[in-house]
Amino acid sequence: MPYIGSLKVNQFRNLADVDITPHSQFNFFFGQNGAGKTSILESIYYLSVGRSFRTHLPQRLIQDNTDRFLIFITLYNGTQFIPLGVERDCHGDRCLRINGETASSWSLAAKRLPLCSLSAMSHRFLLDGPRVRRQFLDWLMFHVEPSFFSIWQRLQRSLKQRNAALKAKLPLGEITHWDKMLVEDGERLHQLRQNVVTEFRPLFTQMLQQFLPAYPLIGHYFRGWSEKYSLMEQLQINLKQDLQRGYTQAGPQRADFRLTLRDLPAQDILSQGQQKLVTYALHFAQGLLLKEKTGISPIYLIDDLPAELDANKRDCVIDLVNYLESQVFISGIDPNEIRLPPHSTLFHVKHGKVAAL
């Protein structure tokens, strides 16, 4: 299983100079609000995917009165430790290095460092638009389907070109020129998503029993165009409206994965607390499927766990992480609110300084 063997963070948010050796399984960071606990988790997340889960403004990640931040880890990949690090300056320039080499794509870091992140906003999975749910499915496919990323990249290129042609109101031949490529990759992407949903559903049901046994939610996958037509037929039917609107209305870029309870949208029935529990079940099912398909468990980042769940559900989270054999980074205010297993390390965070206890 991959795990982070060392973590160094410099000038990231309020973390001036952090150098710690995490445990290969459980790591709990405690301290008062604003101490820097969430920033530890955020730095790991940034290194994996190249963005923050808290802000869309990367300039805010650089510590005040400094001009750059640095995040560096050694990552155990099952056979050896490899170095992985990123530096970003105030001008927006950034450099990602993996095993001593400059990486050409952030997907290389994401592949080596698979993460599942859970935070106070996790319940937005049900409330936000389809994009966040597509990303959830695509994360799984990225890690379990070798062909996914190249298909997804080609689809994005052809979709971008078709939308540009629609917006510019180019001749029909220049617009439909992109249809064949879009359809080929769109149908392939749909099939991959459909397959992964089929494998995911029973695992989600299994995990949901741990958190909300009285709520048998059902996951429904919508491919992004009518079941009555092929994608090519749908593009032809929609062409006039696409021209009016300046973008492609149908296709896998409109797919969704919705949860229902007794044929009603889950978000219309469940409380906010229950929605958070559903999100936990989703992400643990995600980790379980990844482990079944690849033998690899993701690293979990769980922000403010005690505030999110009651004692029984917190124990359930600990047991599931233990079952998955995942490394986990958990934050909270009071360490006594977590039943930490023997194989764990406790870190105190105060004013941006982190110390192992």
From Swiss-Prot:
A single GO BP: SOS response
InterPro entries recorded: DNA-binding_RecF, DNA-binding_RecF_CS, P-loop_NTPase, RecF/RecN/SMC_N, RecF_2
Main location: cytoplasm
Cellular compartments per GO CC: cytoplasm
Keyword DNA repair: yes
Entry's localization field: Cytoplasm
UniProt-annotated binding residues for ATP: 31-38
SUPFAM superfamilies given in the database record: P-loop containing nucleoside triphosphate hydrolases
GO molecular function: ATP binding; single-stranded DNA binding
UniProt keyword list: ATP-binding, Cytoplasm, DNA damage, DNA repair, DNA replication, DNA-binding, Nucleotide-binding, SOS response
Role: The RecF protein is involved in DNA metabolism; it is required for DNA replication and normal SOS inducibility. RecF binds preferentially to single-stranded, linear DNA. It also seems to bind ATP.
Family the UniProt entry places it in: Belongs to the RecF family.
UniProt name for this protein: DNA replication and repair protein RecF
Name of the encoding gene: recF
